[in-house]
């Protein structure tokens, strides 16, 4: 599950939270204390780290860590 660990590290760094808090069910705003700007910056960091593009309409649907993992798994090799 190296992908999850990579994503977890990016999220923990971007949101300045302990990696243990970054679980698949953790919601960025509700559980990790992110605001809308934090979420935008997080999406940009994930795009850069994984060399993908997350369109705005997809980014709006990403509310928790599991959503990010699924999106990257589904689109990284596309």
From Swiss-Prot:
It holds the Pfam family PP-binding. It is found in: Cytoplasm. 4'-phosphopantetheine is transferred from CoA to a specific serine of apo-ACP by AcpS. This modification is essential for activity because fatty acids are bound in thioester linkage to the sulfhydryl of the prosthetic group. Pathway: Lipid metabolism; fatty acid biosynthesis. The modification O-(pantetheine 4'-phosphoryl)serine is found at residue 36. GO terms for biological process: lipid A biosynthetic process. Residues 1-76 form the Carrier domain. GO terms for cellular component: cytosol; membrane. GO terms for molecular function: acyl binding; acyl carrier activity; phosphopantetheine binding. Belongs to the acyl carrier protein (ACP) family. Carrier of the growing fatty acid chain in fatty acid biosynthesis. This is Acyl carrier protein. It comes from Helicobacter pylori (strain J99 / ATCC 700824) (Campylobacter pylori J99).
């Amino acid at each position: 599950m190296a992908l999850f660990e990579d994503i977890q590290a990016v999220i923990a760094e971007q949101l300045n939270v302990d990696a243990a808090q970054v679980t698949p069910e953790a919601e960025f705003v509700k559980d990790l204390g992110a605001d809308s700007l934090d979420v935008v910056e997080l999406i940009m960091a994930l795009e850069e780290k994984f060399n993908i593009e997350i369109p705005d309409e997809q980014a709006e649907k990403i509310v928790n860590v599991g959503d990010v993992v699924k999106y990257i798994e589904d689109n990284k090799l596309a």
